[in-house]
Amino acid sequence: MPALTCFVDGAAALLHPPGYALAGDFTLPLPFTFSAAATITDDADATAVEDSNSIWSPSLSSKLFRIDGWGFPYFGVNAAGDISVRPHGSATMSHQEIDLLKVVKKASDPKCCGGLGLQLPLVVRFPDVLKDRLESIHAAFDGAIQLQGYESHYQGVYPVKCNQDRYIVEDIVEFGSSFRFGLEAGSKPELLLAMSCLCKGNREAFLVCNGFKDSEYISLALIARKLALNTVIVLEQEEELDMVVEISNKLCIRPVIGVRAKLKTKHSGHFGATSGDKGKFGLTTIQILHVVKKLEQLDMLDCLQLLHFHIGSQIPTTELLADGVREASQIYCELLRLGAQMKVLDIGGGLGIDYDGSKSGDSDESVAYGLEEYAAAVVHAVKYVCDRKNVKHPVICSESGRAIVSHHSILIFEASGASTNTAPSLSSIELQYLGEGLSEEALADYQNISAATLRGEYEACLLYTEQFKKRCVEEFKQGTLGIEQLAAVDGLCDLITETIGVKDPVKKYHVNLSVFTSVPDFWGINQLFPIVPIHRLDEKPTARGILSDLTCDSDGKIDKFIGGESSLPLHEMEGHGGGYYLGMFLGGSYEEALGGLHNLFGGPSVVRVLQSDGPHGFAVTRAVAGSSCADVLRVMQHEPQLMFETLKHRALEFCGQHDDDSVVNAGVLANSLAQSFDNMPYLVSSTTCCLNALTNNNGFYYCSGDDFSADTVSVATSVAGEDENWSY
């Protein structure tokens, strides 16, 4: 650390122009260096792990980033310092673990280097994890049912709004077929895709129709019942009943009807806004009685078979959960007493995700229970109420979309560089400009800085420094101070501040990503997700940073992280930047569905990865390039082909009218324009980098990008063929 008195003394000599004398003795003491006690710092964000370990290891990184908390049982850190994926959860054997960095290499390396040539950002999906989540939820309920002697079964549905991707929905229908797992729709397009997918599912699987409805929605739902799909129309508003009755009579299709109840039970978190008397959806007890009476008058009371409720996502505790389930169970029993042929209690969503690994019910970022505790609380609450009322136990249905799909999808993005507000060195500050043009008031401010330095009053020194800088800025605005003088003042003040130790140590890591497209919940509702480097975890992170995206928007950043942190432990960028890969985890629900097109940054590339018995343990079974510039332009009603023709004509007009070389140059320009339309909107290195990691994962080689392509990769349906062609 440079001695503060050194550069204050040096600057002082330049601050005494001829004929101008400052009062007081400005003979400074010998240079000294601040001790740790004298340094004003803010180490609140430093963790015990960072402070106490000079030798680093992957296990320490796992603790630092809480991976064993939020990542269990699907994610860990391997001996090489890379994130490893355990596709089968706790049942994953060591040789089945997948090195995430190798998956990124396979996807992003150019074809000439053996990769698929996909551009980052990249979403990596693991259907094996999705399958394990479905099986784990079903097993939790099945275990609770057997243990407690519950006399019915569990039969869940996946709310497709969480992620409507075709392959995710098809996988859920396939993986859940053996235990009658169904789908939930909340709009007409979602209903159409659910109907189509369930044609390949279990005949007993529920198709739950939620959301606001018009005559076309209700007609589709009734047609689905005609197609032998186990469809239930859930009334969100009392008025919907009249449409259901009218259209069912016209189509001669007897409906199965459910009602959504507005419970009194409400949780206080952000996600609890849809619950309680003031909730957006559902019927009050008065409205439910109106529905029962009308169905009874129409001799259709036997059609009422399901009660649905939802007290909000991310239910924090099983106590709150059980309270809501007991209330709903009472309504269920009352409907049976009134003559409805009730069969199903749909407890809605709410099965939470532990985003921060704390296993706490004190915030929206975590929950104080696991799958087994959740299922046990639900089964016990329903059984308790029904047994007291001597009512047959209903089928228990849940809509646990977040818990099903969050873990199986990982967003990978690259940090292209890092910047910090590091003060310039004393030698780089052109101090001679400080002797020109400063007002008497500014020179007096400097006198105060010098005096405070002599006395060792560093707090006062900071105050005088701030005042000195502020005064000089005002003089610059008034035109009495030149830019050279202002730059010298800025450099000197920054150097003083950094030397005392209050300079912000947090770096800004520039990431090849759009927060608005890929992490919209962070921007919209301050939802936090675990973000971790996917490699170099055998090295100690020596920097702290926030993430700044590509968009031209001040909100395009991630500056809040799990654990209440305002910065993230990161590694120093190597070389000229790039090659530092971060993963955002637990974002498989909602993020892709909610993402927008701010600055026309489109969706990321996507790969689907299965665990295999190949030499490297995985197979890429599907790879799709992200949205190109042409794709996102079409969304905004531009026509890329016409745009290209216009620009091509312009190139020929201004670059191709003199000689043969100009014509060639015009052709090169046209080809470059065409390539720009085909490429993704995100940054691309001028030289395509092969992520060919050496033993320490830090060495890369480069090759020509001529073979780079962002074409969609289609793969044969044969598993053996997939493994042979795409295994890494």
Curated annotation (Swiss-Prot):
Q: Which residues bind substrate?
A: 345-355
Q: Which residues carry this modification: N6-(pyridoxal phosphate)lysine?
A: 161
Keywords, comma-separated and alphabetical: Decarboxylase, Lyase, Magnesium, Putrescine biosynthesis, Pyridoxal phosphate, Spermidine biosynthesis
Q: Which InterPro entries match?
A: Ala_racemase/Decarboxylase_C (IPR009006), Arg_decrbxlase (IPR002985), De-COase2_CS (IPR022657), De-COase2_N (IPR022644), De-COase2_pyr-phos_BS (IPR022653), Orn/DAP/Arg_de-COase (IPR000183), PLP-binding_barrel (IPR029066)
Annotated GO biological process: arginine catabolic process; putrescine biosynthetic process; spermidine biosynthetic process
Protein name, entry field: Arginine decarboxylase
Q: In which pathway does it act?
A: Amine and polyamine biosynthesis; agmatine biosynthesis; agmatine from L-arginine: step 1/1
What are the names of the required cofactors? pyridoxal 5'-phosphate; Mg(2+)
Note whether Coiled coil occurs among the keywords. Answer: no
Q: Does the keyword Protein biosynthesis apply?
A: no
CDD domains (alphabetical): PLPDE_III_ADC (cd06830)
Give the domain of life: Eukaryota
Task: Report the source organism.
Answer: Pisum sativum (Garden pea)
Biological classification of the source: Eukaryota, Viridiplantae, Streptophyta, Embryophyta, Tracheophyta
* Pfam families, per the entry: Orn_Arg_deC_N (PF02784)
Q: What GO MF annotations does this protein's record show?
A: arginine decarboxylase activity
Entries under PROSITE patterns matching the protein:
ODR_DC_2_1, ODR_DC_2_2
State the EC number(s). 4.1.1.19
Under catalytic activity, the entry for this protein gives: L-arginine + H(+) = agmatine + CO2
Family from the record: Belongs to the Orn/Lys/Arg decarboxylase class-II family. SpeA subfamily.
